[in-house]
């Protein structure tokens, strides 16, 4: 019974077990997963990326690539897949390749800088710094700068942790020595000290906030031994410094995957021209060990390439189009999602005997339904997934009217996507 002014909420669980599915496998929201599980077709695209990475690592040259695709075609999905593949397989001391996904270039270079730092992640940076400091503190003598006698004794016996050493020492003096020894070519001392402070137990959060452009008080800046915060005026130089610091840490190759490049076409002309010139400068100032991989929508790519700028000349040298899915690829995508949630009692023979119109791997979708989805979706991946999800929901809601997913269900029940 409903109370006045309220609706009675019942938590209903949709049961898809009669279709040999543990749940509806298609995503409810068209947002790419952080760690994509299912990637269908795109073999040529993946091969292209493999070749780009191989060339960057084997020749140490910088490579620029632009992927052009409609909204919903899977650009973000692929960029995240590229990032995860590099970091899972090539982020080693031998290869030293790190990939960073950037959701959007933002409105100026400071936005891009903050996104790159955030994309790298605090955890990875702290791991790199701890490994670096552990080697340095155990091969050089810093005992005189440790004021806690018990920690100093542990340090001499190589028992003290990085956190213990830094929290009970003149850590700024330690960082100054390390800076002079390793970071002489880095222009910004703020970047050096904030970077090293990421390993300090009391200053790590402050240092991370500094790198993300968040406001810090005078005391926090003093704790980091930093003079100024990051803004649009110093972001580009800090980017160059961070790239060099990462190389000192052992990151020899950096892969920057920038999504939604079309955002720069929406900027006012003066601001757009300045930002484009900084992006061009970013490419020119990093002739080795880098991969800049951009994604952009076709209409905005056409608009961008009509501009005869230095950035466009660099981008237009290597680009390709991400094609929409054909019927065969639509089928393969739906099949893969269904397979990911098949129940243990799924048996192909059961389906063949009861529903000969359905291929077992596609059940409860008929072959004609796949054709209808391909046509209605126009081959756009996000549309295919949306149609798949809605089809199963309707099937579950109207089982007597639709025992399986048919073209009639798709065309009559789903008006627009």
Which residue stretches match the model-derived regions?
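Eukaryote-specific, cytoplasm-facing alpha-helical/coiled-coil scaffolding segments in long proteins
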Residues: 77, 142-146, 264-267, 400-402
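The catalytic "switch" region of P-loop NTPases
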Residues: 2-26, 40, 44-46, 201-365
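P-loop NTPase nucleotide-binding core
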Residues: 64, 69-249, 381
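Short, surface-exposed basic-aromatic patches at helix termini and helix-loop junctions that form
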Residues: 54-58, 81-94, 281-285, 309-314
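C-terminal alpha-helical "lid" subdomain
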Residues: 2-5, 165, 177-180, 187-198, ...
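Extended charged low-complexity segments that act as oligomerization/scaffolding linkers
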Residues: 5-39, 68, 88-89, 93-126, ...
């Amino acid at each position: 019974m409903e109370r006045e002014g309220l609706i009675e909420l019942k938590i209903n669980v949709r049961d898809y077990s009669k279709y040999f599915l543990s749940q509806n496998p298609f995503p409810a929201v068209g947002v790419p997963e952080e760690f994509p599980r299912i990637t269908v077709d795109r073999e040529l695209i993946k091969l292209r990326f493999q070749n780009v990475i191989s060339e960057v690592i084997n020749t140490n040259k910088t490579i620029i690539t632009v992927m052009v695709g409609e909204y919903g075609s899977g650009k973000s999905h692929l960029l995240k897949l590229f990032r995860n593949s590099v970091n899972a397989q090539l982020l080693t001391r031998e290869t030293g390749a790190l990939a960073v996904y950037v959701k959007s270039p933002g409105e100026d270079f400071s936005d891009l800088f903050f996104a790159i730092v955030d994309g790298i992640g605090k955890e990875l940076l702290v791991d790199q710094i701890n490994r670096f400091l552990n080697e340095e503190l155990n091969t050089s003598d810093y005992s005189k700068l440790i004021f806690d006698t018990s920690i100093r004794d542990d340090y001499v016996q190589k028992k003290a942790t990085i956190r213990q050493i830094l929290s009970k020492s003149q850590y700024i003096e330690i960082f100054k020595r390390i800076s002079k020894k390793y970071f002489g070519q880095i222009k910004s001392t703020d970047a050096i000290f904030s970077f090293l402070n990421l390993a300090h137990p009391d200053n790590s959060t402050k240092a991370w906030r500094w790198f993300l452009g968040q406001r810090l008080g005078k005391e926090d800046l003093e704790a980091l031994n930093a003079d100024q915060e990051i803004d649009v005026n110093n972001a580009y130089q800090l980017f160059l410094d961070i790239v060099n610091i990462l190389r000192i840490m052992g990151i020899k190759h950096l892969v920057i995957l920038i999504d939604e490049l079309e955002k720069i076409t929406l900027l006012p002309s003066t601001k757009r021209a300045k930002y484009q010139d900084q992006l061009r400068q970013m490419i020119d100032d990093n002739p080795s060990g880098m991969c800049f991989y951009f994604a952009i929508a076709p209409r905005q790519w056409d608009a961008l390439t009509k501009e005869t700028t230095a950035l466009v000349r660099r981008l237009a040298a290597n680009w390709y189009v991400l094609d929409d899915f054909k019927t065969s690829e639509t089928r393969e995508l739906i099949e893969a999602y269904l397979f990911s949630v098949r129940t243990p009692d799924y048996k192909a023979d059961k389906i063949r005997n009861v529903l000969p119109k359905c291929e077992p791997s596609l059940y409860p979708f008929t072959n004609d339904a796949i054709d209808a989805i391909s046509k209605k979706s126009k081959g756009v991946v996000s549309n295919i997934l949306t149609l798949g999800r809605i089809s199963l929901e309707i099937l579950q809601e109207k089982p007597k009217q639709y025992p399986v997913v048919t073209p009639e269900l798709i065309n009559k029940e789903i008006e627009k996507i």
